[in-house]
């Protein structure tokens, strides 16, 4: 900052009575209404440096120019006037007018009243019962790294801030503040307005609730929770295991590092929902309005939760995704990783993809899809014989080629043991109602030595098949795929948790689809 002059007060200092007269463009005066005697400092139209002393009450009129104003422990009265001023008043109960220009105001401790005036101003939060008026412009309330030590709430809608454990303040603390910037590690709760806000937070476990508008939100490290309204957002959740409640359009959202959850509530008026974490985008068809399918860009999210009734298609990525559908008919695909898929209510379609996945259809008639024998052995936790379907899709790793005419067999095999012949024609599904001789990994031991042959002892392979078995001592059934190559090629596709040997007799062809 280029300075035209430096004006320093020569008061009594240390709380003593101020001198009279002038010194270095300073003088004294007494305010009749407050009975406070001020040391007066006056600037010029050029950039000035105006510095008070000790405990003296200082009255500063900076004039135009980009001024530096510093006062200490007195109850000061500061007017920045025009220019981009830096005002630092330290302790004392101060009254500060920033004036026009982009000012930075640090009131220090004390019960201060700050009127930033026109311009894009920054007001630093300090100890004491302050009132901040940002005035015209795009103004920011800034929280320093050591300003707070316990959780704190800032409500831009009501103009109040207070310690989070306490009841909401009934008196407004500030007005005309659009942005919040924090360097603190304390946990903050921020409620913004429907306008354009910029929220930049530190390393605490923060909560941000947006009313809508065109906002930019950066939460930094910590386990943060961000709830968006209807509007256009740029969101960076930073490090930590974060949760984003989405209700936005035309936004760019970066989950950052950590295990992050995308939550979508149907109450925002969405008819259909499509989220692809692998291709990193999201789109909706809202009631009465359609979008082009690229409205929201997603990055580095691991989990998705749908709340309410909205028809959803959710596709995971290579991470270990946790995907939870809502109360409508959902299509959930895990893609890569060891995923957990939960359909919730509705008639859902679940495909774990690669990895060892856990699938729960929830209420409704659900379909569990398998596309490859090399994807890993999944677990279905709630398969219901009366309602649910196992679907097997032809591909190079789950070859069920042939007429596509399914042959379904439910029957007993007296002793399914090593060396047994089991006839499986193309697309044959066999549900065995007699127990296999071993449990647990022993099921694999037995099935991998079974030949799929003609049944005459020659072990001539005639096709691939799906085999459903259970052990007498186990409460679970297992679904295997047996290829044409003979013994040792059976691959476990999934475990049906809670489906017992007795339940296998109730399977029908309707429980299986080969596509």
Where are these regions (language model features)?
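Acidic glycine/aspartate-rich repeat arrays in secreted/surface proteins
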Residues: 147-153, 160, 269-272, 367-515
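Disulfide-stabilized cysteine-rich extracellular repeat microdomains
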Residues: 46, 55, 65, 74, ...
């Amino acid at each position: 900052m280029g300075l035209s002059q430096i004006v320093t007060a020569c008061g009594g200092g240390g709380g003593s009575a101020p001198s009279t007269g002038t010194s270095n463009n300073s003088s004294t005066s007494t305010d009749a209404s407050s009975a406070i005697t001020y040391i007066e400092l006056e600037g010029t139209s050029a950039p000035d440096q105006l510095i008070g002393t000790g405990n003296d009450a200082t009255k500063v009129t900076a004039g135009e120019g980009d001024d530096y104003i510093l006062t200490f422990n007195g109850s000061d009265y500061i007017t920045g006037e025009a220019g981009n001023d830096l005002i630092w008043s330290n302790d004392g109960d101060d009254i500060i007018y920033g004036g026009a220009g982009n000012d930075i105001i640090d009131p220090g401790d004390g019960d201060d009243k700050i009127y930033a005036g026109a311009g894009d101003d920054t007001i630093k939060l300090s100890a004491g019962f302050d009132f901040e008026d940002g005035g015209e412009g795009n103004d920011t309330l800034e929280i320093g790294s050591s300003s707070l030590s316990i959780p704190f709430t800032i409500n831009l809608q009501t103009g109040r801030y207070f310690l989070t454990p306490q009841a909401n303040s009934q008196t407004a603390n500030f007005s005309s503040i659009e942005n919040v910037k924090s360097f603190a590690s304390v946990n903050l709760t921020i409620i913004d307005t429907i306008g354009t806000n910029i929220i930049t937070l530190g390393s605490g476990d923060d909560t941000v609730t947006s009313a809508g508008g065109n906002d930019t939100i950066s939460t930094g490290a910590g386990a943060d929770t961000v709830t968006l309204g209807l509007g256009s957002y740029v969101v960076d959740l930073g490090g930590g295991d974060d949760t984003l409640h989405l209700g936005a359009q035309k936004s760019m959202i970066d989950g950052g590092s950590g295990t992050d959850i995308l939550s979508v509530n149907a109450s925002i008026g969405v008819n259909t929902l499509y989220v692809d974490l692998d291709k990193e985008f999201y789109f909706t068809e809202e009631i009465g309005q359609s979008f082009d399918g690229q409205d929201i860009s997603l990055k580095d999210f691991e989990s998705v939760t749908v709340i309410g009734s909205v028809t959803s298609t959710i596709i995971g990525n290579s991470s270990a995704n946790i995907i939870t559908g809502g109360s409508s008919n959902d299509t959930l695909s895990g893609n890569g990783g060891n995923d957990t898929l939960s359909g919730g209510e509705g008639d859902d379609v679940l495909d774990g993809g690669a990895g060892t996945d856990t699938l729960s259809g929830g209420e409704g008639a659900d379909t569990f899809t398998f596309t490859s024998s090399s994807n890993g052995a999944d677990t279905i936790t709630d398969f219901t014989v009366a309602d649910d379907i196992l679907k097997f899709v032809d591909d190079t790793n789950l070859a069920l080629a042939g007429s596509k005419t399914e042959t379904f067999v439910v029957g007993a095999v007296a002793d399914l043991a090593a060396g047994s012949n089991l006839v499986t024609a193309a697309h044959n599904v066999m549900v065995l109602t007699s127990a296999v001789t071993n449990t647990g990994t022993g099921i694999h031991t037995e099935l991998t030595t079974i030949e799929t042959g003609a049944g005459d002892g020659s072990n001539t392979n005639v096709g691939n098949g799906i085999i459903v078995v259970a052990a007498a001592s186990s409460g679970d059934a297992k679904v295997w795929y047996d290829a044409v190559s003979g013994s040792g090629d059976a691959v476990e596709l999934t475990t049906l948790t809670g489906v017992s040997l007795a339940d296998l007799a109730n399977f029908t062809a309707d429980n299986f689809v080969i596509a």
